[in-house]
UniProtKB/Swiss-Prot annotation:
Family: Belongs to the TRAFAC class TrmE-Era-EngA-EngB-Septin-like GTPase superfamily. EngB GTPase family.
Molecular function GO terms recorded: GTP binding; metal ion binding
Gene from which the chain derives: engB
Classification via PROSITE patterns: G_ENGB (PS51706)
Location of the EngB-type G domain: 26-200
SUPFAM superfamilies membership: P-loop containing nucleoside triphosphate hydrolases
GO biological process: division septum assembly
Physiological role: Necessary for normal cell division and for the maintenance of normal septation.
Top-level taxon in the UniProt lineage: Bacteria
Name of protein: Probable GTP-binding protein EngB
Taxonomic classification: Bacteria, Pseudomonadati, Pseudomonadota, Gammaproteobacteria, Enterobacterales
Gene Ontology cellular component annotations, sorted alphabetically: cytosol
Pfam families linked: MMR_HSR1
Length: 211
C-alpha cells in the first residue's frame, strides 16, 4: 500500500562537499539531479511548499554541495550539485563532477533518481549520461521537463512525447513528465512517484528486518 508523505514537513539536515561528510548511509534517499539551470531548487521548494528550503540562485552553478533534506525518519531528498555549466572554473567543475559521481556510485541508500531538464532543451549529453548511469545500476528514474509554462500546450505535449520516445532505447524504469514550479504543473505526479518509491522501499526494509 502506498503511503502519503508530508513533504511540507521536510527539513534541511546537512550540506556536504563529498560523500564522506554526509549523514549515515542508511534509510532511503531519492536524489534530484540536473544541469545548473534546470530548476532543481525551485522544484524542491515547490514539492515541499517551502519557499526557502533549497536556495534558488539567479546564477546557475551556485549549488556546489550535496544538500540533504529529511522528509521523515530515514527518508531523505538529496539536492545534487548542478552539472554542465560553462562559466564555472574548470578545476571547480571537475571537483563537483567527482563528488557527484562518487555519490551516485557509492551511496547505498540511493534508491531513485529525479533528473530535471529544461523542456526547451532536453536530453543534453550529460542528461543522457545521468540516465544511462541510473539504468546501468537498475535505479528507477523520473525525468521532469521543467519550465513547462514557457511553452504553449501543444508544444509542451509535443516535447513530452518526443522525450518519452527518446528514452525508450535506454530500456530502463524511466517515467517522463512535464513540470512547472510556477504553475504547479506536474507536482502531483512528482509526489505520487516519490510516495511510491519511498513506500515500496520502506515496506521492503520492514520485511527484511522481520525475517
Amino acid at each position: 500500500m502506498t503511503q502519503q508523505y508530508n513533504y511540507h514537513m521536510t527539513r534541511f539536515i546537512i550540506s556536504a562537499p563529498d560523500i564522506r561528510h554526509l549523514a549515515t548511509d542508511s534509510g532511503i534517499e531519492v536524489a534530484f539531479a540536473g544541469r545548473s539551470n534546470a530548476g532543481k531548487s525551485s522544484a524542491l521548494n515547490t514539492l515541499t511548499n517551502q519557499k526557502n528550503l533549497a536556495r534558488t540562485s539567479k546564477t546557475p552553478g551556485r549549488t556546489q554541495l550535496i544538500n540533504l533534506f529529511e522528509v521523515t525518519d530515514g527518508v531523505r531528498l538529496v539536492d545534487l550539485p548542478g552539472y554542465g555549466y560553462a562559466e564555472v572554473p574548470e578545476q571547480m567543475k571537475i571537483k563537483w563532477q567527482r563528488a557527484l559521481g562518487e555519490y551516485l556510485q557509492k551511496r547505498n541508500s540511493l534508491k531513485g533518481l529525479v533528473v530535471l531538464m529544461d523542456i526547451r532543451h532536453p536530453l543534453k549529453d550529460l542528461d543522457q549520461q545521468m540516465i544511462q548511469w541510473a539504468v546501468d545500476v537498475e535505479l528507477p528514474v523520473l525525468v521532469l521537463l521543467t519550465k513547462a509554462d514557457k511553452l504553449a500546450s501543444g508544444a509542451r505535449k509535443a516535447q513530452l512525447n518526443m522525450v518519452r520516445e527518446a528514452v525508450l532505447p535506454f530500456m530502463g524504469d524511466i517515467q517522463v513528465e512535464a513540470f512547472s514550479s510556477l504553475k504547479k504543473l506536474g507536482v502531483d505526479k512528482l509526489r505520487q512517484k516519490l510516495d511510491n518509491w519511498f513506500s515500496t522501499l520502506e515496506h521492503a526494509e520492514e520485511e527484511q528486518e522481520a525475517e
